[in-house]
């Protein structure tokens, strides 16, 4: 959803 929603290889 934004740049702060990046987890491992998944940026949503």
UniProtKB/Swiss-Prot annotation:
One record GO biological process: blood vessel diameter maintenance
InterPro entries: Urotensin_II
MF (Gene Ontology): hormone activity
UniProt subcellular location: Secreted
Disulfide bonds: 6-11
Entry annotated with the keyword Secreted: yes
Highest taxon, organism lineage: Eukaryota
Signal peptide start and end residues: none
Family, as annotated: Belongs to the urotensin-2 family.
Described function: Urotensin is found in the teleost caudal neurosecretory system. It has a suggested role in osmoregulation and as a corticotropin-releasing factor.
Name of the protein: Urotensin-2
Organism: Gillichthys mirabilis
């Amino acid at each position: 959803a934004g740049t702060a929603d990046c987890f491992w290889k998944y940026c949503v």
